[in-house]
Amino acid sequence: MVMRSVDLRSDTVTRPTDAMREAMCNAEVDDDVLGYDPTARRLEEEMAKMMGKEAALFVPSGTMGNLISVMVHCDVRGSEVILGDNCHIHVYENGGISTIGGVHPKTVKNEEDGTMDLEAIEAAIRDPKGSTFYPSTRLICLENTHANSGGRCLSVEYTEKVGEIAKRHGVKLHIDGARLFNASIALGVPVHKLVKAADSVQVCLSKGLGAPVGSVIVGSQSFIEKAKTVRKTLGGGMRQIGVLCAAALVALQENLPKLQHDHKKAKLLAEGLNQMKGIRVNVAAVETNMIFMDMEDGSRLTAEKLRKNLEENGILLIRGNSSRIRIVIHHQITTSDVHYTLSCFQQAMLTMQEPSRT
């Protein structure tokens, strides 16, 4: 029987801390759909202040937060949004911007670092004079950090250049900042500088920050007022959400300072894995709390076989594809867990790569 468990599937797997549970039990609450929950107001005001925006809104999930933002900016059905071909909104959010929002996605290739070529973004913007034949571009979306690129960070300079393109063409800029605080810590830049160019931002509370539930979207006061209506339409209006927001307020105080340690542990794990025969990790690309580990070409191993072997020792992982495993560090992973994980990997690699005896 496995006694030790090291859950590296995602930073969404964390359990509420004792301080969070206490805050949730004692949270001051009211009906948030009617706009009276005081703890929700505290969280929204704090997030708006941190992001340098006028207002904020608690939403049940990052997927809903992104969908609401796209629908507010693209309020004419058939509008077009420009976004990366490997971004979360396009790949992992069930096509909601199209099926629910009536918004047409136009993809631009994501580079290895999560950026999109600036010239390609500008070239993708439709000429309004041709709107009889194709959709009107109303929005550009960025993702920071970029999950499918391994948690890579978009710089202030890059984001501002995209913002300049958006303004030049009269379109809006939305940032999917599910792990925005990770980018802030990694780059050593306050979050408000990372999103200054954006008209709206979605920030997840249950990923790096480790709260149990929810996301927040921020933007102008008029944007948030429209977002409230869309949230209600999508079924995202909830009553006494102060119970959830109380945990998020604790997360901002308790876990935000821990993100730098998550990044150090991710780098430590990546460096150790990269020294093992049969495994390849681009250590330089490990900028935050995420690691992509690939099986070397010609290896007898598959990601799924390795994942199952490690699971027997309590190491929980998600397979990216047949030759890739994704690893995500969070605040409940200790340095001891990292060393234990490396020892389990080392043992698995030795036993699984041994030639079969006939």
Swiss-Prot record:
What does it catalyze? L-threonine = acetaldehyde + glycine; L-allo-threonine = acetaldehyde + glycine
Swiss-Prot/TrEMBL cofactor(s): pyridoxal 5'-phosphate
- Its GO biological process terms? threonine catabolic process
A Pfam family per the record: Beta_elim_lyase
> Which Cys pairs does UniProt list as disulfide-bonded?
none
Q: Which domain of life is it from?
A: Eukaryota
Catalytic EC class: lyase
Q: What does the sequence similarity comment in the record state about its family? A: Belongs to the threonine aldolase family.
Can you say what this protein is called?
Low-specificity L-threonine aldolase 1
